[in-house]
Amino acid sequence: NELAQTALFKILMGELEPDEGSVKWGVSTIRSYLPKDNSPYFDGNQMELVDWLRQYSAKKDDVYLRGFLGRMLFSNEDVFKPVNVLSGGEKVRCMLSRMMLSGANVVLLDQPTNHLDMESIQAVNKGLEAFPGVVLLASHDHELLTSTCNRVIAFQPDGTIIDKYGTYDDYL
């Protein structure tokens, strides 16, 4: 269920303590997380989009950041919008931008295509297909799962775990 997958991701990111056991990541692991609820990053925040992204970028100059945001489908004056007025899809694109700038080699995405239009969903698909690291993905988007997954770990209602190498369609 969705509550459990979100809890698992929060445990993996160290935002929530597990009831039992522990999580240990390798020393060279750099993680980035796209939470299903991204409101804490935006609610009440009056920063302009370009300045919001600047805080997550090693490169701080406007030309680089505006070019980056352009590739994320933000045009011209959109980069000066306050982040608290962005649409749900725009906020997801902001969070994906933040992830790309993080240098992560492991990304955790909790329902990444929620609130996105078709063009943005296709861009997410392409980006994940090209990502050289590890992707942990929770999604109801069959197309996204089919195009990006080469291993499925499914938690069953009875507590068993299915771990299958292959595509999502192979799992089904």
Summary of predicted features, one role per range:
Residues 1-172:
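ABC ATP-binding cassette signature C-motif
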